Amino acid sequence: MSEFLHRLYRQGWHADPAVRPVGRLMIAAMVVSCLYALASVALAKSLADFQMHRQGMDDGSLPASAKAIVYGAYSLRVITVVSLIFGYSYLVQRLSRRSPSEHRLLLSWSIFGVAAYSYLIFTPNLPWTHVVQAIQMVILLAVAVLLFTPRVRAYFAGASVD
């Protein structure tokens, strides 16, 4: 695990100077996403209660066993943490591959992320979740903007970047 984290740090935080800001922002997005997923696990009961109340299921008719299943389902978000770590590390590794297809992959991923978090901000949920989603959206928007800069585009095109 330490080798994995060391490689992620080396490939993202200390990437080529042309894409170093992108790597650092992607690592920041990964950390925020993981903290959000862990907080969701820790606060699974309050999140589940909020959603059940919002959907009208919290009128006392729901048996305790059904509520336990809902709480358990929210607790499974720990799987999200693992998938986020591996997903972001996969994308950070793409920074070292200088090809237009890698640039398109990173660009489409960041634009999709901005769109997804923009949608999630307007869905009913607890206020703290919207704050975290807004932070994630801003980070991914910054990644997308950086990927459009001439220096980063030249890097992925294989040209020399000063």
Describe the role of every protein-language-model region.
Residues 1-47, 162:
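Cytosolic juxtamembrane helix and N-cap/initiation of the first transmembrane helix
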Residues 19-33, 74, 78-81, 85, ...:
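Residues within membrane-spanning alpha-helices of integral membrane proteins
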Residues 29-74:
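Hydrophobic transmembrane helix segments
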Residues 35, 115-119, 142:
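Transmembrane-helix signature of multi-pass solute transporters
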Residues 57-62, 79-90:
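Hydrophobic, membrane-facing alpha-helical anchors
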Residues 85-104:
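Juxtamembrane helix-break-helix junctions at the cytosolic face
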Residues 100-137:
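Hydrophobic alpha-helical transmembrane segments of integral membrane proteins
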Residues 139-162:
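Membrane-water interface at the C-terminal end of transmembrane alpha helices
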